[in-house]
């Protein structure tokens, strides 16, 4: 058998070119087949997919449980505030006049305290005793003798009993109300006293 003849440039003769192409095609086909086999082997089986779903469900359950724990630890009120019946109260350690006290509460996202119930009144009266004279958000600045809270609501007749004996007397232009001992007293708004801020407590129910 005659050996294949090399061309002038060292390549095989034209008659042997189809054999080279066949070898090249075989190599490429083999490589492609191997790549397909490897790719298929990486695809997850139905059991693996189910396991992945189960793992994700467990992770979600764990996160939900963690959120519940965080919610229980969530502070309903800021530090130095006191919680009572769904509200937060700040009892000042410094003294201001009535208008400055109102401003200080606004700066904290609150309001100079407005009393909505007899239970709240009892709580505030007892708690404010340690500071003696303490401002609340009640005045008759708009019209003498007509008492209104800062939210514009009038003083209820059922709260009249909390005035101290002989009060309010408007001596010397007393238009703002303070907690004093066991009751309420009207005083000059320019006087410096302790003060109480009030705002609604947080709920810790923010969405994920």
From Swiss-Prot:
Highest taxon above the source species: Eukaryota
Topological domains annotated Extracellular: 38-208
Matching CDD domains: CLECT_DC-SIGN_like (cd03590)
Positions on the Cytoplasmic side per record topology: 1-16
Membrane topology, record value: Single-pass type II membrane protein
Gene3D superfamilies named among the record's database cross-references: Mannose-Binding Protein A, subunit A (3.10.100.10)
MF GO annotations: D-mannose binding
GO cellular component, one term: membrane
Ranges that cross the membrane: 17-37
Disulfide feature: 77-88, 105-197, 176-189
GO biological process terms on file: endocytosis
Location(s), subcellular: Membrane
Ranges for domain C-type lectin: 83-198
Keywords per UniProt: Disulfide bond, Endocytosis, Lectin, Membrane, Receptor, Signal-anchor, Transmembrane, Transmembrane helix
Pfam family, one: Lectin_C
Function text: Putative pathogen-recognition receptor. May mediate the endocytosis of pathogens which are subsequently degraded in lysosomal compartments.
Official protein name in the record: CD209 antigen-like protein E
Organism (species): Mus musculus
Gene from which the chain derives: Cd209e
């Amino acid at each position: 058998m005659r050996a294949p003849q090399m061309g002038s440039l060292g390549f095989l003769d034209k008659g042997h070119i189809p054999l080279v192409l066949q070898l090249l095609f075989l190599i490429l086909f083999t490589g492609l087949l191997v790549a397909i086999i490897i790719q298929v082997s990486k695809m997850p089986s139905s059991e693996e997919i189910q396991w992945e779903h189960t793992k994700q469900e467990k992770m979600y359950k764990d996160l939900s449980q963690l959120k519940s724990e965080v919610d229980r630890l969530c502070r309903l009120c800021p530090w130095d505030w006191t919680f009572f019946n769904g509200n937060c109260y700040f009892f000042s350690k410094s003294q201001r006049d009535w208008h400055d006290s109102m401003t200080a509460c606004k700066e904290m996202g609150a309001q100079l305290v407005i009393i909505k119930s007899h239970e709240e009144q009892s709580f505030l009266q007892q708690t404010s005793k340690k500071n003696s004279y303490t401002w609340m958000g009640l005045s008759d600045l708009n019209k003498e003798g007509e008492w209104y809270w800062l939210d514009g609501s009038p003083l209820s007749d059922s709260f009249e009993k909390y005035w101290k004996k002989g009060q309010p007397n408007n001596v010397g232009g007393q238009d703002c109300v303070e907690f004093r001992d066991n009751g309420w007293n009207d005083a000059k708004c320019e006087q410096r006293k302790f003060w109480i801020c009030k705002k609604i407590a947080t709920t810790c129910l923010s969405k994920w």
